[in-house]
Amino acid sequence: MRLISKKNLLSAIESYPDAQSAIESWYQLIKDNDCQGLEFVRNGYSRSVEQVYGYTIFNIKGNQYRLIVQINSRTKIIFFKKFFTEAEFSKINWNDRDEVKQKLGEIFT
């Protein structure tokens, strides 16, 4: 899998150094595997993984953070969308598609 944009992932590490090890573990799993979709990711990543409106949400560092991406299994590309603390993440109304789009940006197809 190829990550677009690794720069944003590194920025998350810089902003939240306590999450560095967990983020790097996630990245290594993604980089080393030829992702076949959400089920493959769920099987390879022992922490909670959710999917909402085409976004895949990973719990990072014992549920302290959320890493949100879009996975395109066909092109084998993962688009980094956002990295939130649990407090930031919980403020988003996940039942409101427009709010989610506003916070995370457009879905790539």
Feature-to-residue mapping (PLM):
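Basic, Lys/Arg-enriched alpha-helical interface segments
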Residues: M1-Q64, S73-I77, E86-T109
